[in-house]
From Swiss-Prot:
GO terms for cellular component: cytoplasm. It comes from Bordetella pertussis (strain Tohama I / ATCC BAA-589 / NCTC 13251). Keywords: Chaperone, Cytoplasm, Nickel insertion. Belongs to the UreD family. This is Urease accessory protein UreD. Its main location: cytoplasm. The gene is ureD. The keyword Mitochondrion does not apply.
Amino acid sequence: MSETLDQWRAGLTLGFAPGHAGRTVLRERAHYGPMLVQRALYPEGPQVCHVAILHPPSGIAGGDALEIRVDVAGGARAALTTPGATRWYKSNGRQASQDVHLRVAAGGRLDWLPLESIFFEEADALARNRIQLESGAAAIGWDLIQLGRVNQSGHWSQGRLHTATELYVDGRLLWVDQGLVGAQDDVRRQVSGLAGFPVHAALWSFGPRLDAEQNEELAGLMPWSDTLRGAATTMPYDATQSLCLVRCLGVHMEDVRAVMTDAWAYLRPRVLDTPAVVPRLWAT
């Protein structure tokens, strides 16, 4: 796709497959524009392939269009993250967009753990996620969102954010989450909306069904205070699989990210059958 001097067109396609002796390999890697990946890493051993996605270094601005496609084959295990926050800047009258497509086959495992997206003044953004799983797949993912510069008075006074996440299992729509938030919209202040918090996040996981005790334990990790609020729920899919959702509102991204990380650390061994190992990039 073409690009101009003042806007990016960028895309990335990644395919993970089982290799020799239980190793997961990055079998397909293609890109156009300024979107790349660092080399595949194996901090957990050969079974789990870790990849960091590099967004355009200057951030995302009006008119930019990014697309990410990830395909995890049966028997493969992949963990994807980003080395830093994704920054969305002033739109100058043109909407910026990012479309993420995740596919996991039966027997495949995926962690989708990008660091936060920060939407600055006058950003006009469309962020869509489409997750397609086969029964027998297992995956955990999240979105961490900050509206404006939290340390500034009257943060995010102009802008618009449209988000949409759809999760399918065997072609059936299991969960959809859509939001359209303008900087001056009442939903930012309403108790039934963002309740005045500048940071919000959602985590989803699909895989082996959690029992009642595990649901209680997960709920027990959720905070509830004037500055940080979390909640978790589980929806059965069938006798052996379920969808788990975790949401969090907060004043500071660091606190919200910590809640999401704790939830992921609890869910990962139970859903992905893999101990929780925090990506090393997050410590740099």
